Swiss-Prot record:
It is a single-pass membrane protein. Residues 169-177 are cytoplasmic. This is T-cell receptor beta chain C region. SMART domains: IGc1 (SM00407). The chain crosses the membrane at residues 146-168.
Amino acid sequence: EDLANVSAPQVVVFDPSEAEINKTQKATLVCLAKDFYPDHVELSWWVNGKEVHNGVSTDPQPYKQDPKSDHSKYCLSSRLRVSAAFWHNPRNHFRCQVQFFGLTDDDEWTYNSSKPITQNISAHTRGRADCGISSASYQQGVLSATVLYEILLGKATLYAVLVSALVLMAMVKRKDS
């Protein structure tokens, strides 16, 4: 393998989509390791400082980013699926760790860039608090508040008419006496 092409991966974690969470009550985090060469990596998920295997689905092998090139860099993706409730806890910490098997101290490096050594590269995110207000629940709340306001306004108007009628009757009785 060509030492000049050796490069460590860039790692990023993507948060789950709200559409998936609302539809399935599950949350899928996606980890993408890209731009690495050679394809010697191991990917793992860590939740709250502990490695997890349940709910993890990783590509069977890294893929060439440019399949036509002999010296193409590689990419690898992995998914971690958790419950919506677990995702919506901001105390939960999710980390994708990629162990890149690069060069060792014994490998010669004469290029004008930093030596891509064996290293762990991570990306992380935290759970997001669910405020519990979706567009549909907000609209339902506004509709309920409007109906309640109209009922209270109607009730207040009815009481005002009733009190006015009683006052008018009392004034008429007083005149007659």
